C-alpha cells in the first residue's frame, strides 16, 4: 500500500492529478517487495505503527512507535490527525509530539484518561502531515485493543 492523499488537490476526487509521484511510489514499493531491491524510499513507503502501553505513571499518554521511520517531522507546525479513545470508544483529537529519538510519537488528550484506541488520518478527507526522513507520509491507521494499564516507572 502507498499513500497518495498527501498530494491530492481535490479531496472529493480519489484520482490524483500527479500521476508521476504515485507511479514512483508504486515502482519503489514493487522493487522492494518483489525483487528485494532496496531503494532509499522502498522500506519507507508504509510506516508500521506499533502501540506502546502508556507508561511512567501517566495513563492519559500513549506512545506510538513507527518502524521504518527515522527523523519524523510534520509539514505543518502541529501534527494533525491523531485521535484517542478510551473505554467508552469515543474519539477525541490528540496532541502529538515527536519524541527525541524521532521515531516515536507521544499522544495525549485531556478528554481521554485511559487510552484504548489510537487512530491517525482516519477520515475520507485526511491529508497526512507526518513524514519520515525521506518526506514519505505516514499511512492512515486505527489501533484498537491497546491494553488498559500502566507499566511501572523504570529507572
Region annotations inferred by a language model:
Residues 12, 60-62, 103:
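Structural beta-strand/beta-sheet cores of well-ordered domains, especially the beta-sheet scaffolds
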Amino acid at each position: 500500500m502507498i499513500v497518495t492523499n498527501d498530494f491530492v488537490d481535490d479531496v472529493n476526487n480519489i484520482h490524483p492529478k500527479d500521476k508521476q509521484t504515485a507511479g514512483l511510489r508504486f515502482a519503489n514499493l514493487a522493487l522492494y517487495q518483489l525483487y528485494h531491491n532496496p531503494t532509499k524510499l522502498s522500506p519507507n513507503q508504509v510506516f508500521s505503527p506499533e502501540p506502546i502501553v502508556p507508561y511512567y505513571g501517566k495513563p492519559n499518554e500513549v506512545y506510538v512507535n513507527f518502524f521504518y521511520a527515522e527523523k519524523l517531522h510534520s509539514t505543518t507546525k502541529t501534527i494533525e490527525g491523531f485521535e484517542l479513545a478510551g473505554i467508552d470508544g469515543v474519539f477525541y483529537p490528540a496532541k502529538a509530539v515527536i519524541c527525541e529519538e524521532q521515531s516515536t510519537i507521544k499522544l495525549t488528550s485531556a478528554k481521554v484518561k485511559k487510552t484504548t484506541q489510537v487512530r491517525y488520518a482516519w477520515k475520507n478527507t485526511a491529508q497526512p502531515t507526518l513524514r519520515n526522513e525521506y518526506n514519505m507520509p505516514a499511512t492512515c491507521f486505527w489501533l484498537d485493543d491497546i491494553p488498559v494499564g500502566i507499566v511501572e516507572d523504570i529507572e
